[in-house]
């Protein structure tokens, strides 16, 4: 299954949670989910009982859409997490957090992961001083992520950094806002990653 490219606000309403897909609109309380917190369609406001499989599928979809990965990429990451020692669900979230597009978002250089992915693919991001245009590039502890010199005055990047004064920056990156670079200091602990995903259902789904 390819990466989702449809209306993101309709997707959030269908899943019933904010997936951080609309950035500033969500912060301002102007997203479709804020205005209509129920599923789209004629029967969207009806309450329906969801099956165990439905729960498992919903949590997988939430994680996939939030991080902007395809089914193939997601399954590959899950398989890697399952091979490692430790909590498979927590390891999966850690691997997703290491994606370059996600790290760019976490450092506050983009208001959404989708925009962060565009910055990466269009050559606006450097890793350790070299251009990397692969969103799935795995960032490791100690690596320097920087906005390219030509892009440091990009108004969307400047605005995203300004918004971090309101949203804050996660604890596992150190960011020099004025110089527009940051260091990925470590892989976060699961409890540090605040996302509306219950990964145990994902583990159950793929373990069948």
UniProtKB/Swiss-Prot annotation:
Keywords (alphabetical) are:
Ribonucleoprotein, Ribosomal protein, RNA-binding, rRNA-binding
MF-aspect GO terms: rRNA binding; structural constituent of ribosome
Q: Does the keyword Cell wall biogenesis/degradation apply?
A: no
- Protein's GO biological process: ribosomal small subunit biogenesis; translation
Q: Which Pfam families match?
A: Ribosomal_S4, S4
Q: Which CDD domains match?
A: S4
Which Gene3D superfamilies is this protein grouped with?
Ribosomal Protein S4 Delta 41, Chain A, domain 1, RNA-binding S4 domain
What family is reported?
A: Belongs to the universal ribosomal protein uS4 family.
Q: What does this protein do?
A: One of the primary rRNA binding proteins, it binds directly to 16S rRNA where it nucleates assembly of the body of the 30S subunit. With S5 and S12 plays an important role in translational accuracy.
- What's this protein's name? Small ribosomal subunit protein uS4
**Which organism does this sequence originate in?**
Campylobacter fetus subsp. fetus (strain 82-40)
């Amino acid at each position: 299954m390819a990466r989702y490219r449809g209306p993101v606000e309709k997707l959030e309403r269908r899943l019933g949670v904010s997936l951080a897909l609309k950035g500033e609109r969500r912060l301002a309380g102007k997203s479709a989910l804020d205005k209509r917190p129920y599923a789209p369609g004629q029967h969207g406001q009806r309450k329906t009982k969801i099956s165990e499989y439905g729960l498992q599928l919903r949590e997988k979809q939430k994680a996939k859409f939030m991080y902007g990965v395809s089914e193939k990429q997601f399954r590959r990451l899950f398989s890697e997490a399952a091979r490692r020692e430790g909590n498979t669900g927590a390891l999966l979230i850690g691997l997703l957090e290491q994606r370059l597009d996600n790290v760019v978002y976490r450092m506050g250089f983009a208001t959404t992961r989708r925009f962060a992915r565009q910055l990466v693919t269009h050559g606006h991001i450097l890793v350790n001083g070299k251009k990397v245009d692969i969103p799935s590039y795995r960032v490791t502890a100690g690596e320097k992520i920087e906005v390219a010199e030509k892009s440091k005055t990009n108004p969307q990047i400047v605005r995203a950094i300004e918004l971090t004064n309101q949203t804050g920056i996660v604890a596992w990156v150190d960011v020099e806002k004025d110089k527009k670079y940051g260091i990925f200091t470590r892989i976060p602990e699961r409890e540090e990653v605040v996302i509306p995903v219950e990964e145990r259902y994902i583990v159950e789904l793929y373990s069948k």
